[in-house]
Every structure is written in C-alpha cells, then in structure tokens.
C-alpha cells in the first residue's frame, strides 16, 4: 500500500521537474547585442492612450513606402525541402483543410487557455517543458539558420514579418501562428495541459512583479539589455535577428515600465471600442501589443525575431484574448466579418488564405474568426 501511494505521488508530481537542455539550445559565451541593434524597422507606430481615445491608429507604417520593397528584399527566403514540391503542398493542404472541415463540423471539446497567475505550478512547468522540448528538437530544414524546431517558428515569423504587420492581417495571422505554436507543443512535445497567457493589464507598469519574470520560471526582466542568466531559459542561444539579419546572440531583455504602463485596461478598452475590425486591429497593434514588446525590450522589441524570447507567446495570447473580447462584444456578427487590406493593398475577404508555410495546413480567414469553431477549438479562462 505504501509503495502504491509513493508511486502515485511520483506520477502526480513528475511534471514539476524541469526538462534538461540539449547542447544546441544554450551558449553562455554568446553576447548580448547593443540595444540599438534591436531598433529594427517597425511596421506600425506606437499609440499613446490619448491617441487611441481620439480615434487614431497605427496603420501608418514607420517604413517609408519607397523603402518597403527593400525591407522585403532583405527578408530571408523560405527553403523548401527537396522531397516536397509546391504542387503537392497545395494539394495536401487543400485535402487536409477539406478533411478537417468535413470531420469537425463542431468543436466538442473546447480547450481553455489559462492566464499565468491562474495556472498551477505543474501546468506552468509542463508548458515550459514543452517549449524546451521544441528547443531541443532538430530543425525541419526549411530555414537554414535554425538550430532547433523552435527556431523554425522564429524563422517563419522573420520571413513573413513584412506581410503580417502594419496591415489588417496582423491579428488574424498571429492568431493562427499562436495556434500553430500550441499545436506543435501538443503534437511534437506532448503538452497535455493548457496553453498559458499573460494578463498584462494586471502588471501594467510593473511587469517585474509577475512571477513569469523570476528565476523559477522565465528569468529576469530587469537586466538592462544584458543576457538573461537566471530562470529556465538562462543563456538561451538565439540564431535569428536582429531584423532580417542573423547574428548569434543571447536572450536579452531591457524592462521599461514607462512603456509597459501602456498595456493597461484603458488602452485595451479604447481600442476595443472601435466598431470596425481593421480600425480596432490597427489600434491594437500600436497599442498594448507594441508597448508590451517594447517594454520587455531587447529581443522582444525586434519585430522580426521577437519570438526568440518565449515570453512572445504569452504576450500574443494576451493580444488574441483582447481580440476575442472585441468579437464577443459584437455578438455573432463579428465572427463572420473582416475589413481592411493586406500588405499588398488587397481587400481582406472571408476566403482569403492565412498560411504558415506548411507548419500546419493553410486556412481561410473564415476558419479562424471563431476561436471556438472547428478549426481552432479554444477559449480563454476570462
């Protein structure tokens, strides 16, 4: 009987143990890059609360129109493995999407994304272990710079940055990108607990007070642009960025409370008061989204390669949750409607494709508007 109890206790607590690192993932010898190196081209301007309240938005890119083609030309090219052709990718994606929609007309088991403070220690550790698992796995070969499967996600974001920032596709693409991340954690690394998100309104102006940024979990934020040397991502090696260049460096942060103060309820509510999708999305991008990135700073302030900091996905869970609240406030009408344009000036439509370069099947915008629909099948705990 004592043996059975001891075994049950061990099984119940096993998720509390941190996953060990593969040698690829960390490198204490890598330097922190000067902060000015992370001041890469931005595709949307920062919005103050007053600007958000007055109806302004961030749709005006900080890149001059004449410089945009040059910015795009510097973005790395996707490398497709030799055993895959564009023709069979298209066919496979079409078949996969059709099959998915046929087999899952309804979402019968909605997953709940849980806010960090509401999650158990076992769920926190399980989530971090799954991320470290991706960082330990070898890359797919799609992106030559990648050292791990997690790096592939960073390479994907870097490659598509000019297409999915500074336009109305921003919230939609990042919704599917974050879902792709979750799907990889579950399918490739066995995550069984919830995907976590960070309610930044609770720590606006004081991110360091969140246990996320502690030596127990994701490491310190008040490191003045230097390498994060504590927590479970200490000495993390990053091959991507800054910008569209790739200079190996460490995970660095540079907390700025004068910026994170702008992730509070006031600016979230101001953006969510907009009635048009594209107007709300532009406000959200330059509002809490941009202030959160720049407030954490260093790696997170680099638009292209910011997913190199694992906090990226906690942050984008927050942004997606705010988007979902805007949808909820408009009833079913906002689950079947978009407006605005993409990076090429094409009007968004419900049948426009959202792609993640084969990481997961291409979807249509209509497939991902309802997070509780058959494609995504998730909701937030509040």
Task: Report the location of each language-model feature.
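C-terminal accessory segments of proteins
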Residues: 17-382
């Amino acid at each position: 009987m004592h043996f059975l109890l001891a075994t049950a206790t061990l099984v119940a607590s096993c998720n509390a143990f941190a996953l060990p690192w593969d040698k690829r993932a960390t490198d204490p010898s890598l330097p922190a890059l000067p902060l000015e190196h992370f001041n890469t081209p931005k595709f949307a301007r920062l919005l103050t609360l007053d600007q958000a309240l007055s109806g302004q938005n961030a749709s005006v890119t900080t890149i001059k129109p004449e410089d945009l083609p040059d910015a795009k030309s510097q973005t790395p090219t996707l490398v497709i493995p030799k055993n895959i052709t564009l023709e069979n990718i298209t066919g496979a994606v079409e078949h996969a999407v059709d099959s998915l929609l046929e087999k899952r007309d309804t979402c019968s088991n909605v997953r709940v994304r849980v806010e960090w403070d509401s999650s158990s220690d076992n769920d926190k550790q399980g989530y971090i272990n799954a991320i470290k698992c991706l960082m330990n796995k070898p890359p797919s070969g799609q992106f030559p710079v990648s050292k791990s499967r997690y790096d592939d996600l960073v390479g994907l974001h870097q490659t598509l940055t000019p297409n999915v920032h500074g336009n109305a596709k921003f919230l939609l693409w990042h919704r599917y990108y974050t879902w792709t991340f979750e799907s990889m954690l579950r399918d490739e690394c066995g995550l069984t607990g919830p995907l976590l998100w960070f309610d930044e309104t609770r720590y606006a102006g004081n991110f360091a007070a969140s246990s996320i940024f502690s030596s127990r979990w994701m490491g310190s934020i008040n490191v003045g642009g230097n390498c994060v040397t504590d927590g479970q991502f200490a000495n993390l090696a990053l091959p991507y960025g800054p910008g569209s260049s790739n200079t190996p460096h460490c995970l660095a942060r540079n907390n700025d409370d004068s910026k994170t103060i702008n992730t509070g309820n006031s600016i979230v509510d101001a953006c969510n008061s907009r009635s048009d999708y594209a107007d709300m999305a532009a406000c959200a991008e330059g509002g809490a989204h941009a202030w959160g990135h720049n407030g954490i700073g260093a790696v997170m302030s680099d638009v292209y390669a910011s997913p190199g900091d694992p906090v990226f996905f906690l942050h984008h869970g927050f942004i997606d949750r705010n988007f979902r609240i805007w949808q909820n406030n408009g009833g079913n009408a906002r689950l079947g409607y978009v407006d605005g344009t993409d990076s090429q000036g094409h009007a968004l439509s419900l049948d426009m494709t959202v792609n993640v370069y084969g990481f997961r099947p291409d979807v249509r915008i209509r497939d991902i508007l309802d997070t509780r629909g058959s494609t995504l099948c998730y909701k937030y705990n509040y």
